[in-house]
Amino acid sequence: MKEKISYLEFERSDFVPLLKMAKKLWADFKEDELQHLLEKSTESQKYRIIIAKNPLEESVGFSIFSIRTDYVEGADKSPTGYLEGIFVEPEFRKLGIANKFIQLGEKWCKEKGCSQIGSDTWLTDKESRAFHLKVGFWEEEEVVHFLKNIK
């Protein structure tokens, strides 16, 4: 099955399946907000979206990488590549798809002048944290964000 997965640059016709998968990854986002963020990403040269498709040409995963010129925690220099999101449908996991996404993303980031890739996840997301460590990331720091309304 692994060799039958194709990895393709995002095309406009991939938007509906991308949004459907992104809603599974980022379930806390409102759909219109997520749609807006994805549309901005698909229109920018600072992002690379890769879609994995099965032999039936059905989308089974995606990855989004970006080039960041703002501060990335722990990065040695700028620009820094960034793994914005990665998702593989449950029935297609453990086939090496996520690893291939990482390889393709690293290659693109190197081509854009990056020597490191950052990423983030929620402190409580043990599955994501384990995945990041498995594919070669290290934990840079743990942060809790605060907010206060002012009157």
Q: How does the language model describe each region?
A:
Residues 29-54, 64:
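Active-site rim helix/loop that mediates acceptor-substrate recognition in acyltransferases
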Residues 119-128, 147-150:
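Conserved beta-strand-loop-alpha-helix junction that forms the acyl-donor binding cleft
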Residues 88, 94-107, 130, 134:
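Conserved acetyl-CoA-binding loop-helix of GNAT-fold acetyltransferases
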Residues 4-18:
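A short beta-loop-alpha structural element at the N-terminal edge
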Residues 19-33, 71:
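Helix-loop element at the rim of GNAT/NAT acetyltransferase active sites that forms part
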